[in-house]
Amino acid sequence: MARLQEHYQTVVKKALLEKFQYGNVMEIPRLEKIVINMGVGEASQDRKLIEGALTDMTAISGQKPIITRAKKSIAAFKLREQMIVGCKVTLRRDRMFEFLDRLVTIALPRVRDFRGVSAKSFDGRGNYNMGLKEQIVFPEIDYDRVDKVRGMDITICTSAKSDEEAKALLEGFAMPFMK
């Protein structure tokens, strides 16, 4: 069992139960999945760029990402239908908890001028979205082998009904929100 998963079972669940007074233990919010998306728009012109993104994403997440393709053609972006535009990976269970642990304890503190993540990035349904400007904050990425600095979007999906509950859940995992 992952360290953060154990922490959730022993500490976070009890704290949430006391704070929100749930009638049933199944109502307590939990993490459902984490989706990491890396947009590589330049891959539509140069096919080799997606390979670097796939390698980085595999190292960060621990599983093979799927390639995302354009749903429709957009002439302004020189984009045709089914062209490669990025890659994404969906993490669940142990890998999800291990990734969140590495994100909170290692990657976020390595971000330049980091003051905390925004508390306004909840979507109203208990999910949290954030972006990282560079993939080199993760220790799995070798700085010398990076062909291009790419950012990524991270979506943390929870079973929480409200943003307040989701924020309390993520604070239980030591997510560093801005004051």
Swiss-Prot record:
GO terms under cellular component: ribonucleoprotein complex; ribosome
Protein's UniProt keywords contain DNA-binding: no
InterPro entries listed in its UniProt record: Ribosomal_uL5, Ribosomal_uL5_bac-type, Ribosomal_uL5_C, Ribosomal_uL5_CS, Ribosomal_uL5_dom_sf, Ribosomal_uL5_N
Gene3D superfamilies: 3.30.1440.10
Keyword field: Ribonucleoprotein, Ribosomal protein, RNA-binding, rRNA-binding, tRNA-binding
GO biological process, one term: translation
GO molecular function, one term: tRNA binding
Pfam families linked: Ribosomal_L5 (PF00281), Ribosomal_L5_C (PF00673)
Top-level taxon: Bacteria
Function: This is one of the proteins that bind and probably mediate the attachment of the 5S RNA into the large ribosomal subunit, where it forms part of the central protuberance. In the 70S ribosome it contacts protein S13 of the 30S subunit (bridge B1b), connecting the 2 subunits; this bridge is implicated in subunit movement. Contacts the P site tRNA; the 5S rRNA and some of its associated proteins might help stabilize positioning of ribosome-bound tRNAs.
UniProt record similarity statement: Belongs to the universal ribosomal protein uL5 family.
Oligomer and partners: Part of the 50S ribosomal subunit; part of the 5S rRNA/L5/L18/L25 subcomplex. Contacts the 5S rRNA and the P site tRNA. Forms a bridge to the 30S subunit in the 70S ribosome.
Protein name as catalogued: Large ribosomal subunit protein uL5
Naturally occurring in which organism (per UniProt): Rhodospirillum rubrum (strain ATCC 11170 / ATH 1.1.1 / DSM 467 / LMG 4362 / NCIMB 8255 / S1)
Lineage: Bacteria, Pseudomonadati, Pseudomonadota, Alphaproteobacteria, Rhodospirillales
Annotated gene: rplE
